[in-house]
Structures are given as structure tokens and as C-alpha cells.
Amino acid sequence: MANSAQARKRARQAAKANSHNSALRSKFRTAIKAVRKAVDAGDQAKAADLFKAAVKTIDTIADKKIVHKNKAARSKSRLAAAVKGLQAAA
């Protein structure tokens, strides 16, 4: 347990940051799942729209260092390949 005022404040700040970062990580995963779901359903237009929104979300979260920039780039690349594959199949 934190004894000093400084340690108590840092514990409060850490809890607040953890909560905020968890919400952003959840948003990241949800955006990816939405695109994957549209691709699996074969909905080309919806997948393209969701991909555009997902890229914005992924970039924002990577800029805030919630996820590593390489993970963000890898996620975007895989989603782009899935959407492009859907367009090629159509």
C-alpha cells in the first residue's frame, strides 16, 4: 500500500491511465474484428468503409503508444490484404 502522498497520487494516476488504455486497446481490437467480420461475410463495400475507419483508429492508438507502431503496421497490412483479397475475388 502506498504510504506517501506522492505514492498515493501515482497509484491513482496509474489506475486512471490503465483504465483509459484498456478502453483504447478494446477499441483497437473491436475495429479489427469489425473489418474481419465484414470480409468473412463477403460484404465488399462495408469492409472497405470499416477498413478506413479501422486504419484511423489503429493509427491514433499507435501514436499514443498504446500498441507498438510495428504491431499497428502489421494489423493494417493484414486487414488491407484481406480487403484487397475480397475485391479480387469479386
UniProtKB/Swiss-Prot annotation:
GO terms for cellular component: cytosol; small ribosomal subunit. One of its GO terms (biological process) is translation. It comes from Burkholderia lata (strain ATCC 17760 / DSM 23089 / LMG 22485 / NCIMB 9086 / R18194 / 383). InterPro entries: Ribosomal_bS20, Ribosomal_bS20_sf. The gene is rpsT. Binds directly to 16S ribosomal RNA. NCBIfam families: S20 (TIGR00029). Keywords: Ribonucleoprotein, Ribosomal protein, RNA-binding, rRNA-binding. It comes from the Bacteria. GO terms for molecular function: small ribosomal subunit rRNA binding; structural constituent of ribosome. This is Small ribosomal subunit protein bS20. Residues 1-25 are annotated as: Disordered. The keyword Nucleus does not apply. Belongs to the bacterial ribosomal protein bS20 family.
